[in-house]
């Protein structure tokens, strides 16, 4: 009985509650109805006003988003977590820590939830505290671009670090950009003539190609880079960009002063041919992971806006990968093989795909590559190799013979060494030169044990021509005139092919091999031979 009475009480209470709700709802419904009638009387004017108000709200929301401010909630090494009350900044936006000198820029990398974004710091995070205010800049990191950057050194965020005042550029560009569309790309394969005989003949560079430069310390890598910068400027009127990624500060400083001495950088006038972007070894991983993109952005401006053939040097591309792996671990990503970031191929691909030839101009990239423990199967160099069009190998053995540039003619390769691209004559001469050098290499053991006298007449001729070719592959550089005392030479591709054709045909067998050393074209060899003949005649 008690349960039935309780049930009846519950039902009556429920009916009473529903009737009260309906009574309360009636006035609200009538209010909504009357307001709708009023709005319908106002007509089209109210609709327009509503649209304008909505548009104004959107604009104000955008403005608020651009100037959104947050506060630091966590600092984990080079990674900083920032919380925003509203209007989260998008991925890759730049944030600036308020009231900090020098400026500290953070780049948004992840959205964590609870209005928290995880950022990568572009400078040291020493002294940061929780609660410190952070402002959204409203854009990705932007840097100055254009002719004003020539002869200057800047860091990853575009600030000058050469103590020569601000960079007075009117143009700025974001360091993150899409690769050119397929329709914008040039399909023609064309040689970028460097004026360096051994490169142009045996491992030519393609316009818009990527070249791996392998070389240890002291084999002439820096001098080769400077000569390439100088020759591209003179032959093509093009500019160069040098990105020092994870460089030793001392080496970066030495390169800068050598460029001033070599005339590549003009401190007094406006004849500088190169822009420098440095993210040294002591910089945090965020800066080293992005300085590549800063240099590439400077090069893209010259290609897209000025139609230039730009040369982009990256030293060292391995440090780009290394910095990415450091950042990846701090961001909480699960590492892949050998501890590298799981996004290794994506990071490398998104950067390398921007280096290409378009219908406006080209970016040709020369990338120094460090191979960890000489293991070519390591994921970092292996990922880089997939993007290369040519390899230029500098050999210590050739440098010990005082043959500069010390490029190994047998190890260096190029994808465009193809008769359909370089022409049948060029291809045949290059392969003929390599065959003679390979034959000479295989005869060296016999020569070392038995001597030259035990060789056949044919082998003696091969050795004689190979030694002339080896010496003719040397060349005086314009930027090295102060070291060598020889006047630098720029040798055209036609002149290079003519010279080696004459050697292969035996037309120069009567000339002494010393006449071929440190000469430009074949005409210089004839002059040297005449001088030697006069000296011996006297």
UniProtKB/Swiss-Prot annotation:
It comes from the Eukaryota. One of its GO terms (molecular function) is protein domain specific binding. It catalyses: ATP + H2O + 4 H(+)(in) = ADP + phosphate + 5 H(+)(out). ATP binds at residues 215-222. GO terms for cellular component: cilium; mitochondrial inner membrane; mitochondrion; non-motile cilium; proton-transporting ATP synthase complex. GO terms for biological process: dauer larval development; defecation; defense response to Gram-negative bacterium; determination of adult lifespan; embryonic morphogenesis; gonad development; inductive cell migration; mating behavior. It is found in: Cell projection, Cilium; Mitochondrion; Mitochondrion inner membrane. Expressed in three categories of adult male sensory neurons: tail ray B neurons, HOB hook neuron and head cephalic (CEM) neurons. Its EC number is 7.1.2.2. Keywords: ATP synthesis, ATP-binding, Behavior, Cell projection, CF(1), Cilium, Hydrogen ion transport, Ion transport, Membrane, Mitochondrion, Mitochondrion inner membrane, Nucleotide-binding, Transit peptide, Translocase, Transport. Pfam families: ATP-synt_ab (PF00006), ATP-synt_ab_N (PF02874), ATP-synt_VA_C (PF22919). InterPro entries: AAA+_ATPase, ATP-synt_VA_C, ATP_synth_F1_bsu, ATPase_a/bsu_AS, ATPase_alpha/beta_chains, ATPase_F1/V1/A1_a/bsu_N, ATPase_F1/V1/A1_a/bsu_N_sf, ATPase_F1/V1/A1_a/bsu_nucl-bd. Subunit of the F-type ATPase which has 2 components, CF(1) - the catalytic core - and CF(0) - the membrane proton channel. Interacts (via N-terminus) with lov-1 (via PLAT domain). Mitochondrial membrane ATP synthase (F(1)F(0) ATP synthase or Complex V) produces ATP from ADP in the presence of a proton gradient across the membrane which is generated by electron transport complexes of the respiratory chain. F-type ATPases consist of two structural domains, F(1) - containing the extramembraneous catalytic core, and F(0) - containing the membrane proton channel, linked together by a central stalk and a peripheral stalk. During catalysis, ATP synthesis in the catalytic domain of F(1) is coupled via a rotary mechanism of the central stalk subunits to proton translocation. NCBIfam families: atpD (TIGR01039). Belongs to the ATPase alpha/beta chains family. This is ATP synthase subunit beta, mitochondrial. The gene is atp-2.
């Amino acid at each position: 009985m008690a349960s039935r009475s309780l049930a009846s009480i519950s039902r009556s209470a429920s009916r009473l509650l529903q009737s009260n709700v309906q009574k309360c709802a009636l006035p609200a419904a009538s209010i909504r109805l009357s307001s709708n009638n009023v709005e319908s009387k106002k007509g089209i004017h109210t609709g327009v006003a509503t649209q304008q108000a909505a548009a104004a709200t959107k604009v104000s929301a955008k403005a608020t988003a651009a100037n959104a401010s947050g506060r630091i909630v966590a600092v984990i090494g080079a990674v900083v977590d920032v919380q925003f009350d509203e209007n989260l900044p998008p991925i890759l936006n730049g944030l600036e820590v308020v009231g900090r000198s020098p400026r500290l820029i953070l780049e948004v990398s992840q959205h964590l939830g609870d209005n928290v974004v995880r950022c990568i710091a572009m400078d040291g995070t020493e002294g940061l505290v929780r609660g410190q205010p952070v402002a959204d800049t409203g854009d990705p990191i932007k840097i100055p671009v254009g002719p004003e950057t020539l002869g200057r050194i800047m860091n990853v965020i575009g600030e000058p670090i050469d103590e020569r005042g601000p960079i007075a550029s009117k143009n700025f560009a974001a360091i993150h950009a899409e690769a050119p569309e397929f329709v914008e790309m040039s399909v023609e394969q064309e040689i970028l003539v460097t004026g360096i005989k051994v490169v142009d003949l045996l491992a030519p560079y393609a316009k818009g190609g990527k070249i791996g430069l392998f070389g240890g310390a002291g084999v002439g890598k820096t001098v080769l880079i400077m000569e390439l910068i100088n020759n591209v400027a003179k032959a093509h009127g093009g500019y160069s960009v040098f990105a020092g990624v994870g460089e030793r500060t001392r080496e970066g400083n030495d390169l800068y002063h050598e460029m001033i001495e070599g005339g590549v950088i003009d401190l007094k006038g406006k004849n500088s041919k190169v822009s420098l972007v440095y993210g040294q070894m002591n910089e945090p991983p965020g800066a080293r992971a992005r300085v590549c993109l800063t240099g590439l952005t400077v090069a893209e401006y010259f290609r897209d806006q000025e139609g230039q053939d730009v040369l982009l040097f990256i030293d060292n591309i391995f440090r780009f990968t290394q910095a990415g792996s450091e950042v990846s671990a701090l961001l909480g990503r699960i590492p892949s093989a050998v501890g590298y970031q799981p996004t290794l191929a994506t990071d490398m691909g998104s950067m390398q795909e921007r280096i290409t030839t378009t219908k406006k101009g080209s970016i040709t990239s020369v990338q120094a590559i460090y191979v960890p423990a000489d293991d070519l199967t390591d994921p970092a160099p292996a990922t880089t190799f997939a993007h290369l069009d040519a390899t230029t190998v500098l050999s210590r053995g050739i440098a010990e013979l005082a043959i500069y540039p010390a490029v190994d003619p047998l190890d260096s390769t190029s994808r465009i060494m193809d008769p359909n691209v370089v022409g049948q004559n060029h291809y045949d001469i290059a392969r003929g030169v390599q065959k003679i050098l390979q034959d000479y290499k295989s005869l060296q053991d016999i020569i070392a044990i038995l001597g030259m006298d035990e060789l056949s007449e044919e082998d003696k001729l091969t050795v004689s021509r190979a030694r002339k070719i080896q010496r003719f592959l040397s060349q005086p550089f314009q930027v090295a005139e102060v070291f060598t005392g020889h006047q630098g030479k720029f040798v055209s591709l036609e002149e290079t092919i003519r010279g080696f054709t004459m050697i292969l045909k035996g037309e120069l067998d009567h000339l002494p091999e010393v006449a071929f050393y440190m000469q430009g074209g074949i005409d210089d060899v004839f002059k040297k031979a005449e001088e030697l003949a006069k000296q011996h005649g006297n």
